Amino acid sequence: MQFSSAVVLSAVAGSALAAYSNSTVTDIQTTVVTITSCEENKCHETEVTTGVTTVTEVDTTYTTYCPLSTTEAPAPSTATDVSTTVVTITSCEEDKCHETAVTTGVTTVTEGTTIYTTYCPLPSTEAPGPAPSTAEESKPAESSPVPTTAAESSPAKTTAAESSPAQETTPKTVAAESSSAETTAPAVSTAEAGAAANAVPVAAGLLALAALF
């Protein structure tokens, strides 16, 4: 009798435990929960999408919020196809401030239903460098001096030719044969020698004239 009563008690306890056991719902739905966070006397609300789990115990229903069973929280993602925007950066130094417009990329990070926008440099866009200039474009044209002939650079020959008609053919012949300044020196010397030869009879004539007086 005692054995049978023990069996009945264990059966009743087992049925009671079965009636009060927690059940896990696998087909859960989603809902939006507002979370309020406070820091340094400042509070802000954030909406988070989460799952709803219902636990039934007799006629009382408890609802708890938990993450989705197979859905992980989305990690911050960086978009590869970024667009560009212009951001104004203000720099101050020695009580002087100036603004600079900088073109930068826009990356959108989505977490739940909140969208955070951060500014970051463009991934791999570089400004094209200036094209190298050729030597012909940057170097000025060099002017070469025009060679001058002996007849143009030595006017002394013409003077010698005009002053001494007897020696007129000699300087012209030398000027026609040579076009360099080195060969013109003898022509000038020849003209001077001719002038000196003419000066001897003139001096002799002056002495003879002086002897008459």
UniProtKB/Swiss-Prot annotation:
Q: Which residues form the propeptide?
A: 195-213
What species does this protein belong to?
Candida albicans (strain SC5314 / ATCC MYA-2876) (Yeast)
Q: Could you tell me where the Polar residues compositional bias lies?
A: 145-172
Q: How does it sit in the membrane?
A: Lipid-anchor; GPI-anchor
Q: How is it modified after translation?
A: N- and O-glycosylated. The GPI-anchor is attached to the protein in the endoplasmic reticulum and serves to target the protein to the cell surface. There, the glucosamine-inositol phospholipid moiety is cleaved off and the GPI-modified mannoprotein is covalently attached via its lipidless GPI glycan remnant to the 1,6-beta-glucan of the outer cell wall layer.
Which family is this sequence assigned to? Belongs to the HWP1 family.
Residues in the signal sequence: 1-18
What's a single GO CC term here?
fungal-type cell wall
Q: Keywords for this entry? A: Cell wall, Glycoprotein, GPI-anchor, Lipoprotein, Membrane, Secreted, Signal
- Function summary: Cell wall protein necessary for cell wall integrity. Plays only a minor role in hyphal morphogenesis and is not critical to biofilm formation.
> Where's it found, cell-wise?
Secreted, Cell wall; Membrane
Sites carrying sugar chains = N22
Q: Does the keyword Cytoplasm apply?
A: no
Q: Where is this region: Disordered?
A: 120-194
Going by the entry's taxonomy, the superkingdom of the source organism is recorded as Eukaryota
Q: Where is the lipid attached (GPI-anchor amidated glycine)?
A: G194
Phenotype reported upon loss of the gene: Leads to an altered cell wall structure with a less electron dense inner layer of the cell wall, and a disorganized outer layer.
Induction (free text):
Induced during cell well regeneration, by fluconazole, and in high iron conditions. Expression is also induced by TBF1 and repressed by SSK1, and CYR1 or RAS1.
GO biological process per UniProt: fungal-type cell wall organization
The protein's name is: Cell wall protein PGA62
Locate the compositionally biased regions of type Low complexity: 173-194
Q: Which InterPro entries match?
A: Flocculin_t3_rpt
